[in-house]
């Protein structure tokens, strides 16, 4: 019992604004959202926010990546691909800031390298998901044993599994086996 859940803000305690996702296909037309606008959830990711709250908001960012890749932003492939990668990079930067992954910075640099070398096309999404799934692996490895109760560990495992499956849809099957082995080690 306890774990990271003890003494922290519960997801149900968060305001609707904190839990709002701006970059979903359903919301884009209603809010006038533009690819250059940072997701509003980023504003909430401050160091003084309880750990579980930040975890919930990171999940919002990951959901944003999935939504953008499936539905696009204003039907503009270039803007969608660029913003998807930027959002993914921000997730990894947050992991670095939280000290949750010693490998996150190198992963972020790889994402930027892919962005420079590959240009904008469908393959771009595969690498965005690859980077996201990789960051989830490092994240789970770095704090599971130290911070998480069994219940929390299961929650993280399910989240990572969903991200890995999303990556698989975009054809990263050769990497998913490796990620699945990492996930199985924590079950």
Tell what function each PLM region has.
Residues 1-187:
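Mature, function-bearing regions of proteins
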């Amino acid at each position: 019992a306890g774990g990271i859940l003890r003494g922290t803000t519960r997801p149900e305690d968060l305001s609707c604004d904190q839990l709002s996702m701006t970059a979903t296909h359903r919301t884009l037309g209603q809010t006038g959202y533009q690819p250059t606008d940072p997701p509003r959830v980023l504003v909430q990711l401050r160091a003084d926010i309880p750990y579980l709250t930040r975890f919930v908001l990171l999940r919002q960012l990951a959901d944003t990546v999935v939504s953008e890749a499936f539905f696009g932003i204003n039907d503009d492939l270039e803007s969608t691909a660029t913003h998807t990668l930027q959002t993914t990079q921000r997730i990894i930067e947050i992991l670095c800031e939280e000290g949750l992954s010693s490998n996150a910075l190198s992963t972020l640099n790889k994402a930027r390298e892919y962005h420079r070398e590959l240009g904008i096309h469908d393959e771009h999404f595969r690498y965005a998901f690859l980077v996201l799934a990789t960051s989830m692996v490092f994240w789970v490895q770095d704090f599971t044993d130290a911070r998480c109760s069994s219940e929390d560990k299961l929650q993280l495992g399910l989240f990572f599994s969903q991200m890995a499956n999303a990556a698989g849809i975009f054809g990263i099957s050769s990497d998913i086996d490796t990620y699945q082995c990492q996930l199985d080690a924590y079950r």
